[in-house]
């Protein structure tokens, strides 16, 4: 009996909340008559999208080599009432799960499984993103693609190893973030202690070559015509305001302010500290504009 009364009370409360407060709303029409377009009918409510994010690493063991698993799970996603999926097609290693003239296909990624922390390899050759597009749209799902943007490699913890463009191609070291450390400027590719330095190796957003490379990747991704493209990690790296203090960033900043920085980096921020210099505010504006303009 108490349960029935509680349900009835909850229903009454919901009804009160849903119907109350209309008297205080500002009318949107110019009058109440039929001739001037007035009326009391409310527009039909638009259904809000419901998203499922399909992380590459988190689902790699199940999806990397199995179209059947993708079909099975997308059917469940649809039956549960979701409207959209977001497919991660460029995880933190920087390698990709779609076809591109400039990107390297993702062949392995570090995962946690029942067997522990290990590498999971992809041996399949079918198009990962296109499979999600095909199978998702058959079910009436919208399919969005997501990339980790300013990333170029990943250093694994526990001595598992590393993966990514920055590790394969030594010439790309100049693309990596340079931090304003206590002892001076340090390229993050020189920080390789798997206990202290593990994680994503970011690219420098102010490097023009980096931007051109990523725009080429995005151009290839757009050819798939996904319902949306999401730019994850479209930012400076996890060292925060310590990055990026590379020669390329200095050049671009001086172009931004229209003059030379006499004492770099001290005039922006003293090495290894958060003590601001004379150009600190303009430096932050430059960083924000770099991401915005990209």
How would you describe each model-predicted region?
Residues 1-5, 20-21:
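Positively charged n-region of N-terminal signal peptides that target proteins for export
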Residues 9-46:
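Bacterial Sec-dependent N-terminal signal peptides
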Residues 44-67, 145, 150-224, 276:
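Active-site-adjacent "subsite" loops/lids of carbohydrate-active enzymes
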Residues 50-54, 85-87, 143-145, 229-232:
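Hydrophobic faces of well-ordered beta-strands that scaffold small-molecule active sites
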Residues 62-80, 111-138, 211-212, 289-293:
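Aromatic- and glycine-enriched glycan-recognition loops and surfaces
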Residues 82-124:
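Aromatic-lined carbohydrate-binding/catalytic grooves of carbohydrate-active enzymes
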Residues 177-294:
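Polysaccharide-binding and catalytic clefts of secreted carbohydrate-active enzymes
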